[in-house]
């Protein structure tokens, strides 16, 4: 027990020393390759040179590279700011292109309408349109079929148009006027009141404010890409198994811009996509059945739509300031239609096989026949879901896909065609928000458009026996496929980590490592490296970061200068201009934050703040900065507050230290501010002496009271008994003075002021003597101690010298022995090697000697 008691203080001492030595402090690193998810606006870039493209986007220079990163990152195509911005921006471009602007609420009146046919003499006659009968069976066409040119393929009819009459107030508000207008039958809701005429209204005119386009605009496809603003960058999952959601994508690349993509706006299918490959793959939502299927490019799938016939558009002025457009009927227009080219049946079979192999749908799909492509729509469904909706040269086509579905599903006893009849509507449901727009009647002349089919929008419902691929009207899903493998992140170059180095302590200098001058993405090349290796290059990385940010923001600045006039009045132009200052604002914000911690313009900044969580320590050899930041992000607020408090205290200490340092300059003693301080000091000394006098007086009065003695008739302050002074012998008694003052008595005393001065001098003398004796005693004791230590160390000098000499001699002997041993081993090795070589040569020569002996014998 005594043994442990004697060792306990030593153990406690060692624990205390180890705790002091191993204490961790917060170290601030600037320029680390770390990031966090961001939601800032992206910049649009395009190669289109038409007015629409140049007004909406910046010119694309095509100089964008990708860098492979050795990291793991999570990606989600549906929870993604890049895809959401694409949907919003394309809708904005869509509205800008076709822009409905005239309210048509006044046209919500009853109209008398009739289905109309015309003869060549323009004498219209009202008849009932007979439905077109279509024979059942298979009928496919190809590019050489003459019906394509003549628009006379089997089953295609004429567009149903209704001529309507209605009354409205014209320029005279109190007087009704008769108007005539022509509508597509699909845009009207009618009640059959007579045999040939109907009472009709515009569809949904009572539920929505409808607008008409001011002018007919083109909706041509626009190829564009997104670019990250300065200080941000894009990550892309480059894994071929990525299907819209992957929490751990290990094949990640970084870039400043996305790939080029097309502006798409259609239901059922995606056109001219950039993600199509020589395989079929599925993007699926993590929580529901929303999917988008990328179709195989091997089958060369395409769609060719056409609207035949000539049409004219004339204005109708209804009331003052309101102009509505109509089309006079010259001839019943032929029906618009779309032709599907390519090996569609095999493409759909491959889609089914892909679904069967997919791990999410294995439970329902047993074979290809159990997977069906269907169009599920109930009563009252939007026409964009019931029909395939697309935009062809500014016209909105609604195609009945029944023949097409029968063809690809190979349904017997049905009408199977590789083309679909379409009709054109003027009242359109908006695909991005709830609402309706009305557009001008179809443009004059023949319209046609061709597109490559690259994807299928669907909802996949699976049960125990079948799996249904239900086509969908979610236009936004197209951009999940195009940009779902990207994510926008913001660089966070400031990081915290614990080290055992405290501020202002001696630190071994770091070995400098040569770093190549890289661009902005080169800064991210170290993202997959260990923290220890990255910290060695922070100085160069921080310079690369700033230079890359400046270079990155210079690109939009240059292109903005080229198009300053066009960009002045556009929304996207304003967004692009705002992105210019993002980088500098971010850099200044980081430097201001570093300055508040006392780490301005430092790449590695040691502090005096203890590390708040000793259980969290980084693995400098195997952990990346991004992994470390994810572990300690919850400590950022606490560390930031501690660093700010430490910096405030440090500034106070530095201020006090500077005040002390100013005393050693002799000229500062004669400064005006110094004299003011001296005056203050003098006033304090006088006040102190007064207080000291009062205290001494009180103390002495108390002391005399304790002795029971006090001068009776002494004038205060009288500290001693009055000194008796005898009368002069030569002075006459009772001699009156010149003034008749009489005798002044036999005794008198010195004035009390002189006695007080004597007392004060005695006190001061005693104080100085005490200070002198104390200092002299302290110096003598110190000298005696030092002399004693020196005397005690004197005998040790000779043994220490002998010991040093012995150590040096021993080292020299070891070196000599090592040299001798090396030489001996080398000589022995050479001798052994030579002996082995000779023995080997002798063994090898045995067959030759035998042969030579035999030859001699035979000779």
UniProtKB/Swiss-Prot annotation:
Entry annotated with the keyword Calcium: no
Coiled coil: 626-647
Ranges per topology, Cytoplasmic: 700-859
Region listing for V2, in residue ranges: 164-205
Disulphide-bridged cysteine pairs: 44-57, 101-214, 108-205, 113-164, 227-257, 237-249, 305-338, 392-449, 399-422
Region (V3): 305-337
Residues exposed to the Extracellular side: 24-678
Residue segments, region V5: 465-471
Protein name, UniProt field: Envelope glycoprotein gp160
Species this chain originates from: Human immunodeficiency virus type 2 subtype B (isolate D205) (HIV-2)
Protein encoded by which gene: env
């Amino acid at each position: 027990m005594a043994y442990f008691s004697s060792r306990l203080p030593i153990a406690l001492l060692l624990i205390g020393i180890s705790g002091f030595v191993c204490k961790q402090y917060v170290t601030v690193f600037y320029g680390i390759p770390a990031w966090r998810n961001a939601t800032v606006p992206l910049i649009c870039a395009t190669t289109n040179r038409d007015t629409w493209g140049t007004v909406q986007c910046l010119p694309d220079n095509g100089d964008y590279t990708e860098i492979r990163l050795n990291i793991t990152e999570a990606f989600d195509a549906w929870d993604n700011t890049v895809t959401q911005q694409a949907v919003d921006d394309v809708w904005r471009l869509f509205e800008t292109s076709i822009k409905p602007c005239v309210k048509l609420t006044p046209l919500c009146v009853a109209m008398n309408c009739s289905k109309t046919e015309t003869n060549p003499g323009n004498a219209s006659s009202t008849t009932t349109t007979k439905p077109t009968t279509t024979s059942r069976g298979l009928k496919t066409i190809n590019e050489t079929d003459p019906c394509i040119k003549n628009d006379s393929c089997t089953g295609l009819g004429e567009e149903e148009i209704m001529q309507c009459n209605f009354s409205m107030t014209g320029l005279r508000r109190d007087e009704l006027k008769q108007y005539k207008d022509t509508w597509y039958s699909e845009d009207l809701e009618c009640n059959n009141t007579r045999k040939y005429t109907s009472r009709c209204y515009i569809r949904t005119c009572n539920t929505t404010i409808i607008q008409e386009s001011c002018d007919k605009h083109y909706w041509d496809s626009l190829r564009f890409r997104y670019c990250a603003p300065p200080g941000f960058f894009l990550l892309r999952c480059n894994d071929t198994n990525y299907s819209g959601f992957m929490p751990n994508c290990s094949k990640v690349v970084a870039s400043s811009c996305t790939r080029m993509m097309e502006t798409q706006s259609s239901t059922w299918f995606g056109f001219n996509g950039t993600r199509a490959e020589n395989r079929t793959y599925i993007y699926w939502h993590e929580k529901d059945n929303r999917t988008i299927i990328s179709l195989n490019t091997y089958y060369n799938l395409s769609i060719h739509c056409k609207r035949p016939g000539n049409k004219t558009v004339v204005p109708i002025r209804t009331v003052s300031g309101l102009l509505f457009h109509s089309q006079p009927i010259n001839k019943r227009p032929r029906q618009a239609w779309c032709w599907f080219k390519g090996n569609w049946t095999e493409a759909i079979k491959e889609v089914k096989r892909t679904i069967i192999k997919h791990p999410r749908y294995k439970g329902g799909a047993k074979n290809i026949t159990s997977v069906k492509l269907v169009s599920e729509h109930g009563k009252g469904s939007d026409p964009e879901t019931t029909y395939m909706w697309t935009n062809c040269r500014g016209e909105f086509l609604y195609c009945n896909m029944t023949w097409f579905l029968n063809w690809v599903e190979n349904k017997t006893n049905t009408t199977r065609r590789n083309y679909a009849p379409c009709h054109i509507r003027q009242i359109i449901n908006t695909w991005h928000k709830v609402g309706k727009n009305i557009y001008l009647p179809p443009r004059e002349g023949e319209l046609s458009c061709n597109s490559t089919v690259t994807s299928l929008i669907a909802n996949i419902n699976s049960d125990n026996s079948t799996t249904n691929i239900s086509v969908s009207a979610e236009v936004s899903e197209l951009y999940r496929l195009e940009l779902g493998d990207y994510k926008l992140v913001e660089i966070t170059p400031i990081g915290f980590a614990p080290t055992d180095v405290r501020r202002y302590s001696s630190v071994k200098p770091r070995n400098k490592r040569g770093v190549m001058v890289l661009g902005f993405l080169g800064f991210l090349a170290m993202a997959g490296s260990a923290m220890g290796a990255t910290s060695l290059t922070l100085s160069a990385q921080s310079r690369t970061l700033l230079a890359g940010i400046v270079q990155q923001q210079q690109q939009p600045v240059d292109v903005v200068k080229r198009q300053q006039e066009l960009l002045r009045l556009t929304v996207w132009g304003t967004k692009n201009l705002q992105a210019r200052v993002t980088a500098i604002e971010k850099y200044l914000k980081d430097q201001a934050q570093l300055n508040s911690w006392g780490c301005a313009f430092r790449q590695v900044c040691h502090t005096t703040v203890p590390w708040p969580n000793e259980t969290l320590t980084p693995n400098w050899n195997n952990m990346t900065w991004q992994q470390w930041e994810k572990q300690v992000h919850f400590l950022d607020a606490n560390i930031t507050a501690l660093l700010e408090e430490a910096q405030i205290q440090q500034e106070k200490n530095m201020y006090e230290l500077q005040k002390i340092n100013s005393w050693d300059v002799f000229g500062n003693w004669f400064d005006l501010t110094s004299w003011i301080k001296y005056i203050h000091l003098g006033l304090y000394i006088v006040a102190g002496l007064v207080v000291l006098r009062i205290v001494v007086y009180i103390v002495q009065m108390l002391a005399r009271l304790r002795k029971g003695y006090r001068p009776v008739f002494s004038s205060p302050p009288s500290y001693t008994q009055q000194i008796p002074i005898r009368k002069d012998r030569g002075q006459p008694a009772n001699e009156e003075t010149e003034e008749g003052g009489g005798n002044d008595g036999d005794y008198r005393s010195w004035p009390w002021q002189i006695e007080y001065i004597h007392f004060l001098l005695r006190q001061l003398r005693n104080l100085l003597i005490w200070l002198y004796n104390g200092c002299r005693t302290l110096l003598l004791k110190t000298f005696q101690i030092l002399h004693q230590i020196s005397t005690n160390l004197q005998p040790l000098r000779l043994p220490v010298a002998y010991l040093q000499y012995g150590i040096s001699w021993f080292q020299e002997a070891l070196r000599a022995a090592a040299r001798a041993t090396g030489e001996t081993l080398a000589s022995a090795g050479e001798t052994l090697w030579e002996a082995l070589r000779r023995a080997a040569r002798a063994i090898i020569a045995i067959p030759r000697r035998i042969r030579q002996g035999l030859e001699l014998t035979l000779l």
